[in-house]
Amino acid sequence: MNSVKDPVQLALQTWGSGHALPGVLYHDAALYEREIQRIFFRSWLYVGHQSQIPRRGDYLLFEIAGESVIVVRQDEGEGQIGAMLNVCRHRGSKLCDTATGHEARFVCRYHGWTYGLDGTLRGASQMPEGFDRSRHSLRRLQCRVFAGLIFINFAADAAAFELLSDDMAAPLAPYGLEHTKIAHRQNYPIASNWKLAVENYCECYHCGPAHPEYSVGHGRAIPKREWDHLMHEILARAPQVGLTQHHIRRMWLDAGAFGVDRSFERYPLLRGHQSGSRDGARLAPFLGSITGFDGGATDFQLGPTTFGLAYCDHVVLYRFTPRGLRDTDCEITWLVNESAVEGRDYDREQLIWLWHVTTLADKTIIERNQAGVDSRYYEPGPLSPMEDFANHYLRWYVATMSDTAGQTERLRSGGQHG
């Protein structure tokens, strides 16, 4: 007889790989708080694109689980981008209120403490003799910029970001993400636990029934024989248009360290389709060093909750951020060549059409899923082989959140694990 009495730990310890998760894991408030600490505050999180803060003093805010982070351009041009908590070191007042802005320095409007763009305390009037300003800088977070994308980590002992960036540099290089700009960015609030949103993204078993707009042009659900034939064609064509072939799957339990998940996988578009558009036609100028279409698209992952879809002419980024036990933000960013001009080189409504309608459908699916797993009579069912990627994610999640004797601290830490 199992001696574990905590229903959450019992569910984690008795879960069987290849099955959906038990319902309690989607609606236990204490578990949700532990997820924030164990997963989100120890992972590398995508917070924005460098083009959002081009000038010295430009900043954006990233908020998660009650924490607000200032991400600021500290030097001009290609200079340093840093991240710090949006909390005054005097009595804790919030420094910045607007989602984006520009400041020559950060001034607390409560008692006037003033900070430089690097977070150092520059001024604090009428403090007693012996007050050491150097000990009261804003708390800095680890921050890295890779391929134009900005990442932060709350953990002081976070895993080396280079584990992610070194693996992904060559595969992403042809797309020139550092030379893109944001054509559109939109948030899709989903009334569900964050795990259901990520699970849904990690499988395409539902694509045929739920996403006809996607399925008409993408080869994720076609028979293996047809898949293999189309893949052979794009593998032959890719070098001719400036694309190299890589296959990376170092995520979840195979990441080598916590919070540096990365993957890169090409797959075929169906014949007659060049991009993720309504009619399969080109949507925007080619990205980076790409000179033509090879008939394929790319799925990639950067960290545990950021995913991307790269076409030859644009990139779509998905970021999932928990906002509460049953609330998740799905933010989508569409990137195009930095030289592209809206109205001349691309039509914004056509550019976003596919993943806008697909995400609206996903929102309905996921919210319906949440309602079902909340039922006291819900029982986890078996997964399809087409949900293998999602199953890898579930195995990692259960291992991360279990409090068993065999669950080592190294798995939860920033350091490497076996």
Label each residue range with its predicted role.
Residues 41-54, 122-126, 299-304:
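Short Pro/Gly-enriched beta-strand edge/turn motifs at strand-loop
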Residues 21, 25-64, 69:
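Non-catalytic accessory segments flanking enzyme active sites
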Residues 40-44, 93, 206:
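Generic structural signal for secondary-structure transition and capping sites
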Residues 72-76, 80, 86, 144, ...:
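C-terminal catalytic domain of Rieske-type non-heme iron oxygenases
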Residues 47, 95, 121, 214, ...:
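Short clusters of hydrophobic/aromatic residues that line enzyme substrate/ligand-binding pockets
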Residues 52-174:
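Rieske [2Fe-2S] iron-sulfur-binding domain
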